[in-house]
């Protein structure tokens, strides 16, 4: 990836984006072509958080991924890394997903 700061960390302050970009390591292309054999989403309820400001995976692709997994969909206006830019919101979404799963409501 040529610019993680612009693609993955686009909603962080420039100094924070540069820090996280410096920690990036190469990812094998095999993740794009290896057939998945036991996706957890087939056995347990899943939630997909569509990040509307994601520069790495546009929302229309995220919607396709969520649909393929029959996931419950939540949305936020975040870049690709809400765990860094919107931690409070993300924690809330995780708590809601856990509560749905515990209550037994299948998304």
Ranges and model annotations:
Residues 1-9:
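Mobile cap/lid helix-loop segments that border enzyme active or cofactor-binding sites
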Residues 13-15:
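PEST-like low-complexity, intrinsically disordered acidic/proline/serine-rich tracts
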Residues 21-40:
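Active-site nucleophile elbow and catalytic-triad environment of alpha/beta-hydrolase enzymes
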Residues 42, 47-50:
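Short beta-strand/loop motif that positions the catalytic acidic residue
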Residues 52-77, 84, 96-98:
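Conserved loop-alpha-helix segment in the C-terminal half of the alpha/beta-hydrolase fold
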Residues 74-92, 105-107:
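Catalytic histidine-centered segment of alpha/beta-hydrolase-like enzymes
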């Amino acid at each position: 990836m040529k610019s993680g700061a612009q693609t993955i960390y686009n909603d962080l302050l420039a100094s924070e984006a540069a820090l996280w970009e410096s920690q990036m390591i190469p990812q094998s292309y095999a993740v794009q072509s290896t057939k998945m054999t036991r996706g957890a989403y087939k056995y347990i309820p899943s939630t997909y958080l569509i990040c509307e400001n994601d520069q790495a995976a546009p929302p229309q692709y995220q919607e396709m991924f969520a649909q393929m997994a029959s996931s419950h969909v939540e949305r936020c206006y975040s870049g690709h890394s809400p765990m860094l830019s919107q931690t409070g919101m993300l924690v809330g979404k995780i708590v809601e997903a856990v509560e749905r799963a515990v209550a037994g409501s299948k998304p």
